[in-house]
């Protein structure tokens, strides 16, 4: 067990154990120099840190650090954002006052020549149509009704002239201008467009033209609806034509006169219509196909059969001419037969007892019944 040497003042010595090769005074001097070395080392480390910090800050600073601004304490900006203040650009010099450009002077347009007003023409100024000559063709069918309407127009114009119209109105009357008139006596008048129900009494066959009759099946009242002017049982007489065209399905019938049971008669001159008001009367149409084409077909077949039989019965040298002659003869006969029968008109059949209608085409005046009990 070694004992530590004590200091002269009774304390323990600083160096333990003493180096036997170093003198005692050398150990004491070495002990006094050790704190100074530590101090110099700490100062060197601090200076190195300060130098390294300065170098890092100088490298991390932006190139225009001199133009950076520091915001006030209360308006601190978030870190990492740098704002640069650029110098204010000088204001541009004011432009000198320029005189205003004068307004361009445009050439004045030339005035257009005045347009003359259109000539003033009298109303309904048109030429008088040439009068049609009355002939036998006007006495049947639509032509008969046109002639009747023309006569009625002349009578109406004559009545207006008798009433004492002005000179202008007389001028208009001469130009076939219709004037509004007040029809009197509606209790004794049938107006155009009145429908009369009728039952056909005779059969119609259009091979030849002829007459036909029908019986009124329902009372016909006046324009006012207060009086029966055409009673049931009135007989109506009309006529039909035989010129039914190819493809037609209706026959035209013109009713000419009414015969009432009381003995009164009146001219009618109105067309026949079907139950719906369509013009003409429908019926069963026979187009006569067999009569028109049967003879030609038969002759054509006979010609082919004759040619075939002659070709088999004659020899090879002389049979050719005979065959051609027979074929040509049969073809000529077939063409002639077709020309004679192709224009046969069809026939329409309309049975008696069928319900038909009559459409009144002009005003009918029954003033003769005034004051009677008819």
From Swiss-Prot:
Residues 92-117 have a biased composition (Pro residues). Residues 86-117 are annotated as: Disordered. InterPro entries: T4SS_VirB10/PtlG, T4SS_VirB10/TraB/TrbI, T4SS_VirB10/TrbI. Induction: Cotranscribed with ptxABCDE. Activated by the two-component regulatory system BvgS/BvgA. One of its GO terms (cellular component) is plasma membrane. Component of the type IV secretion system ptl required for secretion of assembled pertussis toxin (PTX) through the outer membrane. Belongs to the TrbI/VirB10 family. This is Type IV secretion system protein PtlG. It comes from Bordetella pertussis (strain Tohama I / ATCC BAA-589 / NCTC 13251). The gene is ptlG.
